[in-house]
Every structure is written in C-alpha cells, then in structure tokens.
Swiss-Prot record:
Pathway: Amino-acid biosynthesis; L-arginine biosynthesis; carbamoyl phosphate from bicarbonate: step 1/1; Pyrimidine metabolism; UMP biosynthesis via de novo pathway; (S)-dihydroorotate from bicarbonate: step 1/3. It comes from Streptomyces avermitilis (strain ATCC 31267 / DSM 46492 / JCM 5070 / NBRC 14893 / NCIMB 12804 / NRRL 8165 / MA-4680). PANTHER family: CARBAMOYL-PHOSPHATE SYNTHASE SMALL CHAIN, MULTIFUNCTIONAL TRYPTOPHAN BIOSYNTHESIS PROTEIN-RELATED. The gene is carA. Residues 1-187 are annotated as: CPSase. Keywords: Amino-acid biosynthesis, Arginine biosynthesis, ATP-binding, Glutamine amidotransferase, Ligase, Nucleotide-binding, Pyrimidine biosynthesis. InterPro entries: Anth_synth/Amidotransfase, CarbamoylP_synth_ssu, CarbamoylP_synth_ssu_N, CarbP_synth_ssu_N_sf, Class_I_gatase-like, CPSase_GATase1, GATASE. This is Carbamoyl phosphate synthase small chain. It comes from the Bacteria. L-glutamine binds at residues 55, 236, 238, 265, 268, 306, 308-309. Composed of two chains; the small (or glutamine) chain promotes the hydrolysis of glutamine to ammonia, which is used by the large (or ammonia) chain to synthesize carbamoyl phosphate. Tetramer of heterodimers (alpha,beta)4. Pfam families: CPSase_sm_chain, GATase. Small subunit of the glutamine-dependent carbamoyl phosphate synthetase (CPSase). CPSase catalyzes the formation of carbamoyl phosphate from the ammonia moiety of glutamine, carbonate, and phosphate donated by ATP, constituting the first step of 2 biosynthetic pathways, one leading to arginine and/or urea and the other to pyrimidine nucleotides. The small subunit (glutamine amidotransferase) binds and cleaves glutamine to supply the large subunit with the substrate ammonia.
Amino acid sequence: MTTSTRGAAKVPAVLVLEDGRTFRGRAYGAVGVTFGEAVFSTGMTGYQETLTDPSYHRQVVVMTAPHVGNTGVNDEDPESKRIWVSGYVVRDPARVPSNWRSRRSLDEELRHQGVVGISGIDTRALTRHLRESGAMRVGIFSGSALPDEGTMLAEVRQAPEMKGANLAAEVATKETYVVPAIGAKRFTVAAVDLGIKGMTPHRMAERGIEVHVLPATATAEDVYAVNPDGVFFSNGPGDPATADGPVAVMREVLARKTPLFGICFGNQILGRALGFGTYKLKYGHRGINQPVQDRTTGKVEVTAHNHGFAVDAPLDQVSDTPYGRAEVSHVCLNDNVVEGLQLLDQPAFSVQYHPEAAAGPHDAAYLFDRFVSLMEGQRA
C-alpha cells in the first residue's frame, strides 16, 4: 500500500474489483493505492469501532449507510491502537463533524493513519454486486496512482486472497499484558489474543476478572502458567483453517476441562478442535443488526457480527466429539449459519458474534455472565 496524506477532497479515485467492475469517485482519507478483500458492513453507527477492529485486517470495508463521519473521531472509542482496515468506501462523508467528544474529522484520521479511501460512489450498487457475486479482491487507486484500467485490474488480481490467509499473529499482541479486575478480583482468565478488541477484556474486568492477554502464538504451557480459572479465545482475521497452533492449545484446554469461552474466530477454533470443518461464506456477516436465535431458549437477539468464515456443524443433532457431546447453540436467522457451539459434558461454549457490543446492541452481554457461572461451578 502506498499513500500520501495530502488533502484528498477533489482528487479522482477509482475502485476496481477483481471481476473487472469499476466505480469512479473522489479520494477520501489518504491518497494512493491499496488492496484487500471487498466486504460490506450494514451498521449505521459505530464506524470508529469498525475501523479499529483487528478482524478487518486486509479488508476494504464498504459502508452501506450513506452518511458516514457525522460524529467525527474521538479518543475513547477505538478498539485497538490503530485503524486496521486496508481501505474504506463511503458514499457521502460528513463535511463537518458534530459531537461534543469529537477531536478531529474522520477524513483527517484516515489521512493521519495512511488509510486510502474513496467516496462519492454508488455504495448501494457496490453492495448489491458483492452480495450477488461474493466478497472479492479489490483495489482503490487515487492521485498519481491512476494507471489504465487494465493495469489496475492486473494489480488487483495479483493481491493475496483471504482464503488460506494466516493473519492472527499479524494483529495480536507480541507480549503478554494484564487487564486488572475492576473492584475485587474474583477470577483469573487467560485470553489468547487472535485479534482481540479492547472492550472484550474490559467486559470481563467489569465482572471481577483479571485478564492475562497472551499472544496468538501462546502455547498450552503459556496459558496454564498464569494459573487460570478460565480460558478465552478472541476474535481475529484470516482463515481459521490455517490456525493449527490455537486449535492445538484449545484441545489441551478441553482435555483439562477448564472453563472455556470463545468469540468469533474463537468459535471457529472451537469448531475445528471438536472435529468440525470451516468454510468461507459468500459475502459474510458484518454489521450491528444481525438476528440470531438461541436454540435452547428460542430467544432472538440482535447482535454485532464481523465474520467471513463459519463452522460446518450439523444443526439438528447432538454430535459426539473427542471431548464429549456438542451441539449448535445459536443460528443466524437470515441464513441458518452456525453462530454458537456448546459442549454438554464440560464447561465450554462459544459464539460467532460479538457480545462485547463495541459497537452494537447489548442483547448478548449475558454470555460473559455465563462464563463467570462456569468458573463458579468449577470451583464449587
């Protein structure tokens, strides 16, 4: 990715998909060229959390909401220390942000961090195209980086695909750090960082949990060195089929019957550890308004999603695994994709969506309490 941080408001830009479809607009954010997987997010709010979610590493995010940037950028809402998206696509960016917490405009923040974007294109048409044709490689070109369309298309087709990409270690912490419990400490949790969002350990800390966040390359010995009451596997980018290291660690956790909770990528890791396969969705689930049903209670939750892969597990039967019986606990009501797994003979469960609600609804916050209950039960 090559970028310039000079003003981009009137600089021409072109978005080129790997199937040859092009969209012309204006540069937004940094000027230059970038590549990634084109995906769309249906959230109308929460763009700052979306941009800083490590799960979006190497993806160009298309916002379906037409107006983006209205509330500017503040210093409180980022989910990590930097923007992770490879590129950003909006229809009509706010000219002047308005919010009491705003410190700068979204355009300024994108330029400051060197994120290439494009505005002024028909994002509705682009979203429909991705929905019908599937997520695909894309390039955004602006400024002096505007060669002829044939050259741009060739460059897009040379970019790496998301399938087969092993990305967790690229976004995870390199060193272990500790998020202290808020108030009295009740439990210790080892959290394997595969691309963890900042709000996730905070939600656990609110419940009296001291969270030791470990690198994606952590071994089972590293996990148990902190003497955990429970183990957590986070969200993250890339293809779960490549994550053999975390799968091996999770199998050791399951063998020891330590309380276990996984979110997003962690759900896919649990699926693999139990012997299920994973597969790439046509265009994925991304946004903060996805309906999921808890198959145990029948309750429907509106949830936040960001995943392009899913677990291939039977929906209507209990499966025998090396670690006991397992079943699908949650499904997406839009397409019946597996959104949660639970073991029936030991304290382990996971969900494909994001109960930490950053951004998004708080319907699934109870899952952190369920994790606490599993650790309480193990102590009893």
